[in-house]
Amino acid sequence: VSGWTLEPVRYDHPEVVLLVEAVQAEYVRRYGTGDDTVLTPADFDSGRGVFLLGRLDGVPVAMGGWRARDAEQGEPGLADGDAELKRMHVVAAAQRRGFARLLLAALEASAAVAGRRRVVLETGTEQPEAIALYLSSGYAPTEKFGLYRFEASSRCLAKNLGEPPSG
């Protein structure tokens, strides 16, 4: 895509901070509250994760990251070798142009290179476009995990890396 770039950045990068504020406002609009999951820049440090910033003609329009998660962290639904997607977001003005799919593919590739075996994520019923993206990209429902695992609106999905999308 002409003008589209993806760059690894720290989670506390100023442009990421602005996008996180925007996605939190979107969560409030859809769910009545923001996402209280605690994330730190260290979660995405080299080898244990990555955080990507997508720009279109130099303007930040997308972000997303993965962090290493393993069974010994004691969380139901997690397995050794998991990479958890966090803060996947494309700004409204850039949606429906394939950027989320490009970002997702880059995150999956990065996780695979780092030796992660499965990508897991938590989303919700008020984000049907996200659920559709993940299902069409080979993700399937999995055991609930995370801060919102007891919420009826929570949906957890997983994809084994190295498998082509089904459908």
Predicted features along the sequence, with ranges:
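Alpha-helical hinge/cap motifs
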Residues: 87, 100-101, 124
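Acetyl-CoA-dependent GNAT
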Residues: 3-86, 91-92, 104-106, 110, ...
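C-terminal "cap" of GNAT-fold acetyltransferases
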Residues: 4, 8-13, 17, 117-120, ...
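Residues forming the Rossmann-fold NAD(P)(H) cofactor-binding site
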Residues: 97, 101, 105
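Short coil/turn segments at alpha/beta junctions that flank glycine-rich nucleotide-binding fingerprints
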Residues: 97, 113-117
